[in-house]
Design a protein with these regions (language model features):
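Transmembrane catalytic cores of multi-pass membrane glycosyltransferases
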Residues: 20, 24, 35, 59-61, ...
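Membrane-interface helix-loop-helix junctions at transmembrane boundaries of multi-pass membrane enzymes
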Residues: 2-5, 156-160, 197-210, 273-295, ...
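Membrane-interface transmembrane helices that cradle and orient dolichyl/undecaprenyl
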Residues: 105, 142-163, 280-283
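Extracytoplasmic
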Residues: 90-95, 128, 135-137, 349-498
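Active-site lumenal/periplasmic loops and adjacent helix-entry segments of GT-C-fold
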Residues: 9, 13-140, 385-395
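Start-transfer (signal-anchor) and selected internal transmembrane alpha helices
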Residues: 1-22, 207, 341-349
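Hydrophobic/aromatic-rich transmembrane helices and adjacent perimembrane loops
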Residues: 135, 183-184, 306-341, 346
Length: 498
């Protein structure tokens, strides 16, 4: 018989994994997530072709790319590695959250499963798992760090080399996975050290400092080197440039930024707040409170890259614990006349909110989205997409993209170049060699074409949607580009200077 003590940990791993498989199956052979195709595919392919220096390797916080490149070298294609890995990451995140609730907070198995499922299946958590794999990998180790930070060795409180070495390794893994989550975990650690110095054991505080030093030094090395990798650059303030990417994510002023963040918070978490606010005073866990405070502090910093709204999404994890504690409070309230507890009402409400929103997010298409995510209701479609069934293009445009690129490969001559927006860059690298592709990021393809012409290319091509159907704030292309091939709503254009 299956040991009962393993039932809830198994559920914490298997349920999120199986749910995350759903959009992968519906997408067929294509990956899920903008960053998946826009960044993870091309970066992994470039690494496999030797296109990374030692310093760039360190600067990217390379743990995820080491995994994807290693698995691809072991025999899997990059695309299939990035179809299988997201489900596994979400499963391990559920298990890590369960472990923290069980061992770090001392909750019962039944209670511990609730934050593990809410923190992986609520639509905001699924949005993180849609393409933020580096953050997700870091969060797995984040909760391992918190568990080791709080749990006493063997319950005795004595010094344990194993626990502190594991703590140091897990902390380093966070830093090697994602810089934003690294800042949060180091912030929680700093608050914990200060608290121990003031209220508890100074010896424990010194031990934490000593065993944190390797990760701290690694963090500063990555921070120092990160400007060498353009896609991981930090952008603060309110840029006035007309760069296409900044036009989508930048703010005109500080009040506009705060208003956008407040609206985004309510859009994401209003369904969870009725339960979460019940435990604001009851749930006094120092690490979760520190987690929330640090995220709120980060949202006050005028930041465009990484997006401040993506940082707000990380509140789903502490709020999952607060909502669970809110349910515990409802357990003590009874309606004697109706023989029903508010706990049951709260559980049904939480299940309905999670299932309805998440299922709609996973199975509806971008062209026919669930009402809560459609444009007009959702003013944040560049952060919360209309559906999970897309990557850099909609599920309905994936085959057209493959057809267009294959046609161009069959018909492109020697001294030619393909111009690609970040949207089509990963797609192009799965078909062409890197030296046949010119990435112009989120900018103007006409400027890129002018540059390519000056570099001596005889034929300059562009892949984009047919005119009037373009995404990312560019519905049409310049008249200097003439359509020469179309598949569905995806077209190949040839540059002809006016």
């Amino acid at each position: 018989l299956f040991p009962k003590k393993y039932l809830f940990p198994l559920l914490a791993f298997v349920v999120p994994l199986l749910v995350r498989v759903i959009p992968e199956v519906l997408m067929g052979p294509y990956v899920v997530g903008f960053d998946t195709m826009g960044y993870y595919v091309p970066t992994t392919l470039l690494w496999l072709h030797g296109g990374v220096s030692l310093w760039s390797f360190i600067a990217t916080a390379p743990l995820l790319y080491t995994l994807t490149a290693g698995l691809a070298l072991a025999g899997g294609s990059v695309v299939w590695v990035l179809k299988v890995l997201p489900s596994l990451l979400l499963g391990f995140l559920g298990l890590a959250m369960y472990g923290y609730a069980r061992r770090g907070l001392g909750w019962s198995p039944k209670k511990s499963i609730v934050p593990a499922l809410v923190g992986t299946l609520y639509f905001v958590a699924l949005r993180v798992s849609w393409d933020a794999f580096r953050e997700e990998l870091a969060l797995i180790f984040f909760f391992v760090v918190l568990m080791l930070l709080v749990a006493k060795a063997g319950g005795s409180g004595k010094f344990s080399w194993k626990r502190y070495v594991a703590f140091s390794l897990a902390l380093a893994a966070v830093v090697l996975s994602n810089q934003v989550v690294a800042v949060l975990v180091l912030g929680v650690l700093l608050f914990t050290v200060i608290y121990k110095l003031v209220r508890e054991s100074r010896i424990d505080a010194v031990r934490l400092i000593v065993f944190s030093l390797p990760a701290v030094l690694l963090f500063f090395a990555i921070f120092y080197l990160s400007p060498t990798v353009p896609e991981y650059r930090l952008i603060f303030g309110f840029p006035t440039t007309t760069d296409g990417w900044l036009a989508l994510f930048g703010y005109s002023s500080y009040p506009a930024m705060l208003a956008s963040e407040a609206g985004f918070f309510l859009y994401c978490f209003l369904p969870l707040l009725p339960l979460a606010v019940l435990s604001v005073r009851r749930f006094g866990n120092f690490q979760m409170r520190s987690f929330i405070v640090l995220i709120l502090i980060a949202t006050l910093v005028p930041m465009v890259s990484p997006s401040d709204l993506r940082i707000v999404m990380l509140l789903v994890y502490p709020l999952a614990f607060y909502a669970t504690e809110g349910l515990s409070w409802l357990k003590s309230v009874h309606w004697k006349r109706f023989r029903i507890t508010l706990l049951r009402v709260g559980l049904v409400y939480l299940m309905l909110v999670t299932v309805v929103l998440s299922l709609g997010f996973m199975v509806m298409t971008p062209e026919n989205p669930f009402p809560y995510f459609k444009e007009g209701v959702n003013p944040y479609i560049y952060t919360i997409p209309t559906s999970m069934l897309q990557n850099t293009v909609s599920i309905t445009d994936c085959q057209g993209t493959v057809n267009a690129l294959q046609w161009l490969k069959d018909n492109m001559t020697g001294n030619s170049i393909l111009l690609t927006h970040r949207v089509f860059y990963g797609w192009a690298l799965t078909t062409f060699n890197p030296d046949q592709v010119f990435l112009y990021e989120f900018g103007n393809p006409l400027n890129a074409a002018t540059t390519a012409a000056q570099e001596g290319y005889s034929q300059i091509y562009l892949i984009w949607w047919v005119n009037g159907k373009g995404w990312d704030g560019q519905p049409t292309v310049s008249s200097a580009f003439h359509e020469i091939y179309q598949s569905g709503e995806i077209a190949i254009y040839r540059y002809t200077p006016n």
